[in-house]
Amino acid sequence: MDRERFVDAARLEPHGGRGVLLAIASAISFGAAGPFSKAVLTSGELSPLRLAQFRITMAAVVMLGVVVARHLSGARPTHRWTRADAWLVIAYGSLGFVAVQICYFIAIDRLPVGVALLFEYMSVVLVAVYAAVLQHRPQPRAVWLGVTLAVAGVVVLTEPWSGFRLSVWGSVAGAGAALGCAAYFLIGERGTARLPVLELTAYGAGVGAIVLALVLPVWTFPFSALGHSARFAGQDTPVWILLSVVVLVGTVLAYLLGMSALAFLPSPSATVIATLEILVGAVVAWGVLGEHMTVAEIAGGVIILTGVVVVAERARLRTELPELDYVEARDLTPT
């Protein structure tokens, strides 16, 4: 029997429910911070690339500060790094932090937002296919059903046919966003098996901050914009307050919760649950910004929720392998 299947079983049982809750909390954190990012971008105080740089760099500062403080206090022994660990973190930071955000911002600049979102969330399919075909981890029918429902829900919710147009570079960027998002889950899944979640996320953000600093020098950042105001929920709100939510909730908390979920859930299941982000963003925008949800958005949200419920129920149930009948995960610990 395949070692990878043991890993999947161990992730699902007996803590699959915990993984589901962590993945849902991560999606809520990502989605809830969306309207705050939108307010900053709409105000014109920061460009999309500068916003990405600020959130990643400040998140790195916060998390690396915690890592250093914990090591100095002796609360956690220093991890013995290997060359493989270093390359994994470099890949995670470059793809999971930088590529997905930069490519998405380029995509929405050249494509309708619905089309760009559809591109990005095709990562749900990419992760499931990669796990099944290249990693030889056959996925249960419930996961494939969840993937199908999640993608269908995203299509209905984003209405990509509205104002439809295609751009070559926009499509390339959209594909890059999908690959970056898939890498976030696949590399994160491997990383959580090798490194503590906090260190993986903190050093990954650090790599992302360095990569962006090479392209966008920090000394050219428009720091004066932090003292300006942007319209949020009908009021003038300091940009630094909006960005604080984006950094602490939409980046630090969201990434840490997402990586923690991957310690208990296989990446294909986690990606399906992650599609809740777009629904949460729409609901928060409706509740806070007064943006009305259309019938299509509500219907798409229901479809996404159905897919999440299917996958969550699968994670709750004990793992069933083709060769064995109701195998206990504690008996599947890799040697």
Across the structure, where does each feature detected by a protein language model lie?
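Glycine-/small-residue-enriched transmembrane alpha-helix faces in small-molecule transporters
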Residues: M1-Q53, G163-R190, V211, E323-T335
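C-terminal-most transmembrane helix of multi-pass membrane proteins
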Residues: D2-A9, I56, E159, V239-I241, ...
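Membrane-interface helix-cap regions at the ends of transmembrane helices
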Residues: R5-R11, A59-W81, L149-R165, G208-P238, ...
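Hydrophobic alpha-helical transmembrane segments of multi-pass integral membrane proteins
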Residues: G17-L22, R50-A69, A91, G146-L149, ...
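Specific transmembrane alpha-helical segments of multi-pass solute transporters/efflux pumps
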Residues: S29, R70-A116, E120, V156, ...
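Juxtamembrane C-cap of transmembrane helices in multi-pass membrane transport proteins
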Residues: S29-L46, L51-A52, M58, Q101-L111, ...
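Specific alpha-helical transmembrane segments that line the substrate/conduction pathway
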Residues: R50-V61, Y104-P138, A177, S267-W286
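Hydrophobic transmembrane alpha-helices of multi-pass small-molecule transport proteins
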Residues: M63, V129-Y130, Q139-E159, A178-C181, ...
